[in-house]
Amino acid sequence: MVAKGKKASADAVYAKKTTRSANPFDNSTAQSSKRGNPFDVHVNKEKFKILGRICKHDRGMPGVSRAKALQKRAQTLGQQFAVKHKTNRFKDNRIGKHLSGDQLTESVMNARYLAEKMSQVRSNQKAEKFNLNDDELLTHRGQTLEEIEQYRDERSDDEELDDEALDADFTAAAHFGGEGDSAQDRQAAIDEMIVEQKRRKNEIAKEKDEVYDLTEKLDANYKLLLPLVAKVTKDEQDAKPPPDAYDKLLKEMIFEPRGSVADKLINPDELAKQEAARLEKLENERLRRMRADGEEDEEASVAKPKHRSADDLDDGYFLAGEDDEGDDTLAYDLDGNLGTHLNGKKEAVLKGDENEDDDDKEGEEEEEEDSDEESDSEVDNLSDLKESESESEPEEAPKASKKKAKKSADTIPASLDTSIPFTIKMPKTYEDFTELLSKHATAQKAIIIERIIKCNHPKLEGVNRENVVKLYSFLLQYLKDLFEDASEQDIREHFQLLSKLMPYLYELTQLNPERMSNTLLEVIKEKYEEFRKNHKMYPSLDTLVYFKLVANLYSTSDFRHPVVTPCFIFIQHVLSRSRVRTRQEISMGLFLVTVVLEFVSQSKRLVPAVFNFLQGIVHMSIPKRDVEQLEITPPFERDGPLSKLLALPANTESTKLEPQQLQPTDLVTQTITPDFKVRALDTSLLLIKEALQLVEEHVGACYLAQPFLALLSRLPLESYPEHVHQHHKDATELAEKLAAQKMKPLAPAEKKPKALRLLEPRFEAVYDDKRRPKMSKAKEERAKLLHKIKREKKGAIREIRRDTSFVQMLRLKQTLQSDKERHEKVKRIYQEASVQQGELNELSRAKKKKKF
């Protein structure tokens, strides 16, 4: 029941609903009580009404604006004025507040404690300075002096230790006497003396043998060096005849710089712009082909056979004047030093008499090659490349001196024909071609090829197009015959010939790119069919030479290339399927790894076979017990003798070996020696560092670097030379850096919202009839800037003036408030004093009444 005169809650709800829906046509909302005062609106009148002009400040509400400004100042300046001269926060002013926990030494703690005590003494009253009844306990690191445990030895120095008795050895040596048999003791002493004498004689004989062996070795080395030293001395003593005036003039004319022919109708600035545009176009084309954006049709690519990307120029030694792009392909320069480019300035040697020029080159330049690490990143024009006599090919460890090279050039067999005709016809058969080359030395063979190309250039006659294709096929077959049956004695000479023929092979490729590419591709296909029949064996050495040929002749950074892509897949199949059992197979694998790294130096693609092969080489360099197994991917074996093929025995002394690269004989030798084990591991460490640098920017670089850490940590570095230690340190640091990177979560690519198709508005300049003096663009911009500065300055001065008045008002209020409080205090004091005076007067009157 509900009390009388009261409504239930349901009735109230029903009444509210009925009241709200009583008038369905009443949609007007209640007007806000805060309605603007129309008298606060200030209107700025204009003298003239101009059509089209929009005035932004024709009306305003200064009262409202002033109130908002005061409110904003109260929230900013008012708050700052209220907390002025107030310290309401804790500041750490202790000594050594910026030091961490490990850096807080005993002296810092003592200085901090002393400063705190001095501040406490200053804050207390002067009378408490001499208070001796201070109950404060002195502590050290939170402990009193009584709690600190004292480790003292309370015993005096006069006490004797319990364990100072003589031991058995001392008593047996010092005591005499006994009942032993003197004859037997004498015989034992004689036998012992005889044994000792024999041992000493054996040691002396062993030392003499070692000294004799070392002496013989030093004598042999000295005999090898003696003719070189004697020859150098003899050449230095020979006085050269002074050159006459004719020779001087001839040299000046030869080496005089020649001006480049330019079009006189084109301005040099325009020529520079055209060259910059051409280089930019080539670079964009190379990047487009690397990303495979908008691949062109095969017909369109055939229609433009002469196009070369920027990377193609680099690989072909053609882009003159460009700086090296800094690729880190493992290679060796002309001095045998490790590097990615052939540094230093290249001297431009002009071709005079070709026979004498080639002989001089053989005598003045060293021939150095590297079997598995070759660099094709030297940038130069074709003429300089043809005259260059040394390129980073397989390198020989004992370097021949310049005089020795000259001696080898001078001692040409008499059966070789040193006279080369200037016009050479194209040989009809391959037998005629080989017979022509067999009559001349290595340096002269390159000259023969050059003259055959010049005499059979396609622009001279139409039939020469087939001749250059035939010459290209002959050269490929000739390289196959050279390297297929190469031996330790002639492999160096074969690589030298390949170095000299490389620019002419490039020139032939540019004469007819389509036919030459098809010819080389057919050879690669034939080699791959042979490999498929026995994929567990490495291909022959000529196949590896073809791979290096592809790396030098074609652009390896393209996303898809008709010649490079099949070779790239072929190399990965070899590295991932062929077994590694001998010195030759290890050297071939490292050679292929270097070629692959050259392939991906620009595109930075992932090559799993390279990482697996390098892990296998490090795995074989780790000594393991017979029952110990480490995880490794085929074609490498987990256990057995092949799993530790490159491991150094414990008693091997190889710490004094000099830094050496792989030699050309490694590609044709089967026996594994300790120095080869050191060189193979050293080369692998350098290749690991380079491979990790290439994938440093990839998302999954951490997964590629982690397997190397477990293998590198197991290497026994005490058996290796110092340079191997340094290379191991560099590779380990880079692998740890990449392994520590964190993976970023996958996220869909952000798509730009598609805008609606709208008509573009047409903007027209508003004409205002204001006469302004004509100024230049720079002066007009300066005038606008000065006008804005003037307006902003006036506004800033006005705001500063208003802020000052606001602060003065706050100070006045504070002063009035303090005066009011002071007046109230004075008034209260007077009031209390008057009451007190009244009480005193009353007491004095009471005393007077008592007297009377």
From Swiss-Prot:
MF-aspect GO terms: snoRNA binding
Region described as Disordered: 1-40, 288-324, 338-410
Entry keyword annotation includes Zinc: no
Skewed-composition ranges (Acidic residues): 354-381
Keywords assigned: Coiled coil, Nucleus, Ribosome biogenesis, rRNA processing
Coiled-coil features, chain-numbered ranges: 190-221, 774-851
One biological process term in Gene Ontology: rRNA processing
InterPro entries: Nop14
Location of this chain's protein in the cell: Nucleus, Nucleolus
Record field: compositional bias (Polar residues): 20-35
Superkingdom of the organism of origin: Eukaryota
Cellular component GO terms, alphabetical: Noc4p-Nop14p complex; nucleolus; small-subunit processome
UniProt feature, compositional bias: Basic and acidic residues: 344-353
Pfam families associated with the record: Nop14
Annotated PANTHER family: NOP14, NUCLEOLAR PROTEIN 14
Quaternary structure, from the entry: Component of the ribosomal small subunit (SSU) processome.
Protein task: Involved in nucleolar processing of pre-18S ribosomal RNA. Has a role in the nuclear export of 40S pre-ribosomal subunit to the cytoplasm.
Family: Belongs to the NOP14 family.
Record-given protein name: Nucleolar protein 14 homolog
